[in-house]
Amino acid sequence: MEEYLLPGESSNSCRTRRRSGSIFDRRDAIAHGSAYQKAAALVDLAEDGIGLPEEILEGASFEKAAELYFMFTRFDFLWSLNYLALVVLNFFEKPLWCSKHLAESCNNRDYYYLGELPFLTGAESLIFEGVTLLLLIIHILFPISYEGFNLYWRSLLNRLKVILLLILVADIVVYILLPADFYYLPFRIAPYLRVVFFILNIRELRDSFFILAGMLGTYLNVVALSALFLLFSSWLAYVFFEDTRQGKTTFTSYGTTLYQMFVLFTTSNNPDVWIPAYKDSRWYCLFFVLYVLLGVYFVTNLILAVVYDSFKSELVKQVADKDRLRLRTLKKAFSLIDEANNGLLNEKQCTLLFEELNKYRTLPKISGDDFKSIFNELDDTGDFKINLEEFADLCSAIGLRFQKEDSLPIFEACPNFYHSPASEKLRGFIRGATFEYIIVFVLLVNLVAVIIETTLDIQNNSGQTFWQKVEFTFGWLYVIEMALKVYTYGFENYWRDGQNRFDFIVTWVIVIGETTTFVAPDDLTFLSNGEWIRYLLIARMLRLIRLLMHVERYRAFVATFLTLIPSLMPYLGTIFCILCFYCSLGLQIFGGIVNTGNPNLAQTDLAGNDYLLFNFNDYPNGMVTLFNILVMGNWQVWMQSYKELTGTSWTYAYFVSFYLISVLWLLNLIVAFVLEAFQAEMDLEASARCVDGDDKEAKRERRRNVGTKTRSQRVDFLLHHMLRSELTECSNDNP
């Protein structure tokens, strides 16, 4: 299916080839290496989507700045963990309404229908906030050391982070010093800022919100047109049904009619809302059918089309900006090699670059004749030299066609043992297909065992105990599999694969959980009850989905599904952050209203539908409630009930705005993106099956673009394929 840069030789063929000497760290290469070592490291950085500010690349203190930059990035895991902790704090923080003088303490969870997550005490919360704030300050301000204050402050993003950091510090100080009784409406800005910092420092999330900000004007315009349609339809319905049973019972005023017609626009109260009119005359259904058809199948889809068109325009700008950043980094690498400053590289210079790139990518050993054929193929102008554009194509081909070089396993410290004949034979077996077939067989047997154990459990059969022990044995078999793979590949190389990360986490949770289940006292019901282990075992067997990749008719669909998951993560993360914002707002507006002692609660639809657990009294419950509203399951129940409990129609603004942002905007955006991304993936799969019939230009395009290795590269390639015509126009407009 793939056509390799070297005829008849795959990049994977030399994956196990060991090189003499140590692998050069690109941090050291940029800071202290030769011109070719620096250029190779910059090429690797560019293909990984990492870029240094352009002013640093062109500055005299480039090496020192790069050294500080890479020292900073060594702690990326710590920074990411801290931002995750900021969001997690919202889930465990005690709600502000609990600090008021209440007739019943909020420690009475049943009284307030609270969730099961424990609240942090005041001291614990303060320590948590203090530690995360300290790490946040270091992460935000450290870039000044390698960018310099002037360059750092020139960035709008950096200025925004510093301003928000000062606001967060002020919020914490005020919260500590002022008593809770000072607030008429308990309010803190910290829960919102934590999510904002999470967004600003996760690049994919930040890019998604920047795209949404760019298309906000277009979205508001189309929403305004939809509002005119709703206002006119509601007025028409109010006048038309004024003297009917519908007007006397449901459309009693224009405001009520507008509310009911808006809910009907979402189809949540269809056909309940127009049953009175239907009882009077069956012909009245024509009005409502026409309204639903126009609203749902025309206006909503019109919004979808306009929103997605605006989204693509903003996405093109963002992808083009990333391409320009990558090109600037490659331009710096090109200038390091082009010592004569004539804008061209000859064959010898490219050969030296390939040798240095071997330290970062897995490349076959290239003979002189082989390299000449590669050089001639990449030399589009035919002048036996490569310019910057051709150099960028070369780097793209390397980045897409070849995998990252494996790091040396820790076991290399004992070479006599690790490279003994027995060890080499074992590692060869683990790398082979036979070992994978054995694991698949174990998974299938495990699946049968789970089915039998589940069936016996449902039947309350005593034989279930035996099969639980069998499942326990399977858990340790997976540990052995994991240990063998770590021994063979090294942990860093093992962890690089997404499936291995999933297996590693689930396997250890299963084993620790099963062990705890067997040794825990019976009075600890949650630990001694092994029911939850079964679901983890079922999750472990999701690996069987990959078997479908070997079935021709399913391969394209499964491959597309696996590629779409990382493509969608930024947009799903955007919805999660919107839920966080609205959850914090919901806690501060509606917190504590739903409780057993509220006399108005029994008359609401929340009580009538047994929805009392879905409330805004704590963060976990609030997130679940917003999810229910997001999927439009009787969402008007919460809107109307909280309006009755608060006694103000301003409650509608909270729920209507959530609908406009999350459902009408973001969910429609995701649906449209999935449709186009799926079509793009199917096109790529079809083109891959037609290699033999393609012309030379198409082959060259695939040579430069297919075969992505990492998740980010797959997503980047998919976006470039989806937006190829728009990106071409953009590049023509901005030469």
From Swiss-Prot:
Positions on the Cytoplasmic side per record topology: 1-76, 147-161, 203-208, 308-431, 492-501, 550-560, 676-735
Activity regulation, short description: Inhibited by Al(3+), La(3+) and Gd(3+). Up-regulated by H(2)O(2), cryptogein, salicylic acid (SA) and cold shock.
Intramembrane bits: 249-263, 619-633
Keyword Transmembrane helix included in the entry's annotation: yes
Domain EF-hand positions: 325-360, 366-401
Keywords assigned by UniProt, alphabetized: Calcium, Calcium channel, Calcium transport, Glycoprotein, Ion channel, Ion transport, Membrane, Plant defense, Repeat, Transmembrane, Transmembrane helix, Transport, Voltage-gated channel
Extracellular topological domain residue ranges: 98-125, 183, 230-248, 264-286, 453-470, 523-531, 582-618, 634-654
Biological processes, Gene Ontology terms: calcium ion transport; defense response
Alphabetized GO MF terms: calcium ion binding; voltage-gated calcium channel activity
Glycosylation sites: N460
CDD domains registered for this protein in UniProt: EFh
Membrane topology: Multi-pass membrane protein
Residues that span the membrane, as ranges: 77-97, 126-146, 162-182, 184-202, 209-229, 287-307, 432-452, 471-491, 502-522, 532-549, 561-581, 655-675
Additional information: Rescues the Ca(2+) uptake activity in yeast mutant cch1.
Family classification: Belongs to the calcium channel alpha-1 subunit (TC 1.A.1.11) family. Two pore calcium channel subfamily.
Name the UniProt record assigns to this protein: Two pore calcium channel protein 1B
